[in-house]
From Swiss-Prot:
Keywords: Cytoplasm, FAD, Flavoprotein, Methyltransferase, NAD, NADP, Transferase, tRNA processing
Enzyme class: transferase
Name of the protein: Methylenetetrahydrofolate--tRNA-(uracil-5-)-methyltransferase TrmFO
Record carries keyword Methyltransferase: yes
EC number: 2.1.1.74
InterPro entries in UniProt: FAD/NAD-bd_sf, MnmG-rel, MnmG_N, TrmFO
Organism: Lawsonia intracellularis (strain PHE/MN1-00)
Length: 445
């Protein structure tokens, strides 16, 4: 098939992964990015691959779905995973990155690549005249697609968008935190300083914080959009509304932590994670929120150690838009009625940084196979990548976005003890992925 010239709309994680991978494969790539001409409500810098919700790419453990997915991407030579690994900051068993350094490195690599032409302007319409300029189009506009491109895409697919809201956690300066109260430490680690700064709370202090959280003023949504929260980025106040102890079994859980100032386990703990290598800025883990700025300024200061904290960025809410992929897309992740238009990233219904990278990489592999008139089977659904792709391909009564977890892969056919199940999932995934890598992917590379 004659595929040489490819346009990508959107310079986020998925779009950048597509651009770098396709350029490596030898395609001529035109990457459109609307910044700095136009910013979404959640983006702040003109850099490509900007991380807006958190600087964490989550666990590196192979006994987790996300850890497996990252390892599979590394073995597929993902450009963005390679950059992330070089920009990592201490985060225990997780992979967190210096977000500015990460985005700068991605931007520099794309701007200097001879096979990539970066155009800094909004693509407002998927018109016939635009489509005719390229052999293939990849829409990787992310969950914050501009109204213009959203309306154009909606016209093409003839179906309404679904909406849910993502919340961003506040960031504070490290030197404004009271270290006579807070302490460094990671759960269950006895030695070393630890990768998280912990603010311990007594029962009484937690009650005051919890009560204020429930009463805090929230930002209201557009009246015409239904509010649907993604479970993995649930606003802290929405979690609190589920019950007094919900936070204690979630982001504020104290298990595995001992306060060195008292020698006791706190009743609750708010953890802060470094935003950069020198740990000068930290984000409030699990505190993504739609509280108004004044409410945040008051309520988060109730946490012990944060009474005089300096906010670098308050938390905020933004719309997340995605399509009903199983209904709209082919197995090539292309529109059923416009097969020259492919979709990649969070707009397809994958949720999360690594998942967006994975989707972009997979679309690139699909286009390589198409250009060689070859078919490629996607990885087995027992693998992390295969399970994620199965989710956005398999019809369901109410399709919702998802990040990768073991609930997306087939359950064991034999009886496995609960404590051994994650290890079993990981071993099965590794075996099946290697088999696919050496028996399927090798034929198109």
């Amino acid at each position: 098939m004659n595929i040489h010239n490819i346009a990508i709309i959107g310079g986020g994680l998925s779009g950048c992964e597509c651009a770098l991978t396709l350029a490596k494969f030898g395609f001529s790539v035109t990457l459109f990015e609307q910044k700095p001409q136009l910013f979404s409500p959640a983006h702040n810098t003109p850099l490509l691959a900007e991380l807006v919700c958190s600087n964490s790419l989550r666990s590196n453990e192979l006994t987790t779905g996300i850890g497996l997915l990252k390892q599979e991407l590394r073995e597929l030579n993902s450009p963005l995973m390679a950059i992330a690994d070089t920009c990592r900051v201490p985060a225990g068993k997780a992979l967190a990155v210096d977000r500015e350094l990460f985005s700068k490195q991605v931007t520099q690599l794309i701007e200097s690549h001879p096979k990539i032409h970066l155009i800094r302007e909004e693509v407002s319409s998927l018109s016939t005249s635009f489509l005719e300029k390229y052999d293939r189009i990849i829409v990787a506009t992310g969950p914050l697609a501009s109204p213009n491109i959203s309306n154009s895409l909606s016209t093409l697919i003839g179906d309404k968008y679904l909406y849910f809201y993502d919340a961003i956690a506040p960031i504070v300066t490290a030197d404004s935190i009271d270290m006579s109260i807070a302490f460094w430490g990671s759960r269950y680690e006895e030695q070393g300083e630890g990768d998280y700064l912990n603010c311990p709370m007594s029962y009484e202090e937690y009650q005051i914080f919890y009560s204020s959280l429930l009463k805090g003023e929230k930002v209201t949504n557009s009246k015409v959009e239904k509010e649907i929260h993604f479970e993995g980025c649930m606003p802290i106040e929405a979690l609190a509304e589920r019950g007094e102890k919900t936070l204690l079994f979630g982001p504020f859980k104290p298990v595995g932590l001992i306060n060195p100032h008292t020698g006791l386990r706190p009743y609750a703990v708010l953890q802060l994670r470094p935003e950069n290598l020198n740990k000068s800025m930290l984000n409030l883990v699990g505190c993504q929120t739609k509280l108004t700025y004044p409410a945040q300024d008051t309520i988060f200061r109730l946490v012990p150690g944060l009474s005089n904290v300096e906010f670098v960025r308050f938390g905020s809410m933004h719309r997340n838009t995605y399509i009903n992929s199983p209904k709209i897309l082919t197995d090539q992740l292309a529109l059923r009625n416009f097969p020259c238009i492919h979709l990649a990233g969070q707009i397809t219904g994958v949720e999360g940084y690594v998942e967006s990278i994975a989707c972009g990489l997979w679309v690139s592999i699909l286009l390589l196979a198409l250009s060689k008139d070859k078919k490629i089977l996607r990885p087995p659904k027992t693998c992390a990548l295969g399970g994620l792709l199965e989710h956005i391909s398999c019809p369901s009564k109410q399709f919702q976005p998802s990040n990768i977890h073991f609930g997306l892969v087939p359950e064991p056919t034999e009886k496995i003890k609960k404590k051994e199940r994650k290890e079993w999932y990981a071993q099965r995934a590794r075996i099946d992925f290697y088999h696919w890598l050496n028996n399927e992917l090798i034929h198109i590379m």
